[in-house]
UniProtKB/Swiss-Prot annotation:
Lineage of the species this protein comes from: Eukaryota, Metazoa, Chordata, Craniata, Vertebrata
SUPFAM superfamilies xref list: Cystine-knot cytokines
Family designation: Belongs to the TGF-beta family.
Site positions per UniProt: Cleavage: R60, H61, R230, S231
Record flagged with keyword Transport: no
Record PTM: Proteolytic processing yields a number of bioactive forms, consisting either solely of the mature alpha chain, of the most N-terminal propeptide linked through a disulfide bond to the mature alpha chain, or of the entire proprotein.
GO biological process: hemoglobin biosynthetic process; regulation of cell cycle; regulation of cell population proliferation
Keywords assigned by UniProt, alphabetized: Cleavage on pair of basic residues, Disulfide bond, Glycoprotein, Growth factor, Hormone, Secreted, Signal
This protein's name: Inhibin alpha chain
GO molecular function, one term: growth factor activity
Signal peptide (UniProt feature, chain positions): 1-17
């Protein structure tokens, strides 16, 4: 009596051959491994421990830092800004022309620059002041032989202070003053007043002789707090937007998952042990069919005959005598395109795993 009762309790109910709790994750991973190996074959073993060899490259190319498909290596955030003197008096303007002419006779030229907010917010790596001297090469050589041709000063709260600089290569009748590293913070001020002393230079009102500053900048390095945030330990496996959407869904009743449905699982190739073989994407959402194949009714369908009970939904492609099972609809499976390497990153290969991702499930 008791053995017969036990067999009756363990026997599956009619029409629910695939019913049961959600599949164990290890079972799903084993199935995924089999599908990949069947489509791509086993990975090439070139290193110790059964994994493809690791290419010894800088950190940017190390495992876990592979470039995204269609993207270029990350470039440093650098820029160049050209600053002209703020609008004001020039040699040809009146009534300031007399004052500027007197300054020119003394060999002192005053220029006011207003660096932009973008320039002030960045780290200045180099800066050059281009100044039109009006002297040819012979005149420049004669002036340099008798003493320094150019002196550069900056106006501060303590008065004019010398700006360390050096002369570089320049076109004829021009001088290029390279500011020293200690003078670069001057370009982080809202207003920069430069005083240039050149006894042999003349003041020119021509637009093409306007002096200008060239500043090369880059993004400031992250602060200590930002570096600490960036150094936070990584998650056990890479997340994807699809995985986050799954987590953000409202909870569903357990009964919803009792019948045939499409289940999802976020799988990373690191979890599969293939992160040195399959380098992109780092993870994907694996869809599979699961659930029972009872004969539920559709409450939204109208009754065919008034007073008659609802018509049950018939399983698809049901052969007489066969038991329906929750499975993917034929012809609706999608492929997954991956990028693999067999030499640790020296070369890559694009491959396709066909019929991997389930789109629609039904009792078949």
């Amino acid at each position: 009596m008791w053995p017969q009762l036990l067999l009756l309790l363990l026997a599956p109910r009619s029409g629910h051959g695939c019913q049961g709790p959600e599949l164990d994750r290890e079972l799903v991973l084993a199935k995924v491994r089999a599908l990949f190996l069947d489509a791509l074959g086993p990975p090439a073993v070139t290193g110790e421990g059964g994994d493809p060899g690791v290419r010894r490259l800088p950190r940017r190319h190390a495992v876990g830092g592979f470039m995204r498909r269609g993207s270029e290596p990350e470039e440093e955030d650098v820029s160049q800004a050209i600053l002209f003197p703020a609008t004001g008096a020039r040699c040809g303007d009146e009534p300031a022309a007399g004052e500027l002419a007197r300054e020119a006779e003394e060999g002192l030229f005053t220029y006011v620059f207003r660096p932009s907010q973008h320039t002030r917010s960045r780290q200045v790596t180099s800066a050059q002041l281009w100044f039109h001297t009006g002297l040819d090469r012979q005149g420049m050589a004669a002036a340099n032989s008798s003493g320094p041709l150019l002196d550069l000063l900056a106006l501060s709260s303590r008065g004019p202070v010398a700006v360390p600089m050096s002369l570089g290569q320049a076109p004829p009748r021009w001088a290029v003053l390279h500011l020293a590293a200690s003078a670069l913070p001057l370009l982080t001020h809202p207003v920069l007043v430069l005083l240039l002393r050149c006894p042999l230079c003349s003041c020119s009102a021509r637009p093409e002789a306007t002096p200008f500053l060239v500043a090369h900048t880059r993004a400031r390095p992250p602060s200590g707090g930002e570096r600490a945030r960036r150094s936070t330990a990584p998650l056990p496996w890479p997340w994807s937007p699809a995985a986050l959407r799954l987590l953000q869904r409202p909870p569903e009743e357990p009964a919803v998952h009792a019948d045939c449905h499409r289940a999802s699982l976020n799988i990373s190739f690191q979890e599969l042990g293939w992160d040195r073989w399959i380098v992109h994407p780092p993870s994907f959402i694996f869809h599979y069919c699961h659930g029972g194949c009872g004969l539920p009714t559709l409450p939204n369908l109208p009754l065919s005959v008034p007073g008659a009970p609802p018509t049950p939904v018939q399983p698809l492609l049901l052969v007489p005598g066969a038991q329906p099972c929750c499975a993917a609809l034929p012809g609706t499976m999608r492929s997954l395109r991956v990028r693999t390497t067999s030499d640790g990153g020296y070369s890559f290969k694009y491959e396709t795993v066909p019929n991997l991702l389930t789109q629609h499930c039904a009792c078949i």
